[in-house]
Amino acid sequence: MIEYFFLHEIRHYFQYQMVEDYQAGKETIVKKQHIENWQKDYNSYILPNNQDASTNDEYFFQSIEIDAFVYSYATMKYKYKNVDDLYVPKQYNQFFYDMVDKVVNIFDKQGL
């Protein structure tokens, strides 16, 4: 489980680096649209909890969070196959698992 959350946070570092490179005019390996969405999210970051400590559902639908959860879950699924015990936000439904499967297929094709 710790590996899962490390992967999630490492993905945030990657996102941030892509935003930094894009802003500096450097070539990036991520589509411009994704980077601009990440930049928007970082500039108006929504916290996971509301003032009353209740869960803020909007947090989970930021592009940076969806991407980080998909990446970390897909990496774990690719490596370990059975990942039923990993945390998936209840806000996510089939669209999340469809995105994960697409990433796992990319990993398969690349022979990682």
Predicted regions and their residues:
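Short pre-active-site segment immediately N-terminal to the catalytic Zn-binding motif
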Residues: 1-6
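Catalytic Zn2+-binding segment of zinc metalloproteases
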Residues: 9-27
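Metalloprotease/metallohydrolase-associated module, dominated by Zn2+-dependent proteases
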Residues: 30-111
